[in-house]
UniProtKB/Swiss-Prot annotation:
Belongs to the bacterial ribosomal protein bS21 family. HAMAP family: Ribosomal_bS21. The keyword Ribosomal protein applies. One of its GO terms (cellular component) is ribosome. Keywords: Ribonucleoprotein, Ribosomal protein. Signal peptide: none annotated. This is Small ribosomal subunit protein bS21. The lineage of its organism: Bacteria, Bacillati, Bacillota, Clostridia, Peptostreptococcales. One of its GO terms (biological process) is translation. Residues 36-59 are annotated as: Disordered. It comes from Alkaliphilus oremlandii (strain OhILAs) (Clostridium oremlandii (strain OhILAs)). Residues 43-59 have a biased composition (Basic residues).
Length: 59
């Protein structure tokens, strides 16, 4: 769980912005979205292979 401490004389907006940035860097939101619905292992493998194919074509 991401946790920040509000600094002295820091506005709530700035603290919220820091918290959101910290969550984005740690990948919490993307992990939650990934786990929102069950995905069969075969579907995971298929998506992984397609992503590898896309990445290979970029380079």
């Amino acid at each position: 769980m991401s946790e920040i401490k509000i600094r002295e004389n820091e506005s709530l907006d700035n603290a919220l912005r820091r918290f959101k940035r910290q969550c984005a860097k740690s990948g919490i939101l993307s992990e939650v979205r990934k786990r929102e619905h069950y995905e069969k292992p075969s579907v995971k493998r298929k998506k992984k292979a397609e992503a590898a194919k896309r990445n290979k074509s970029k380079f």
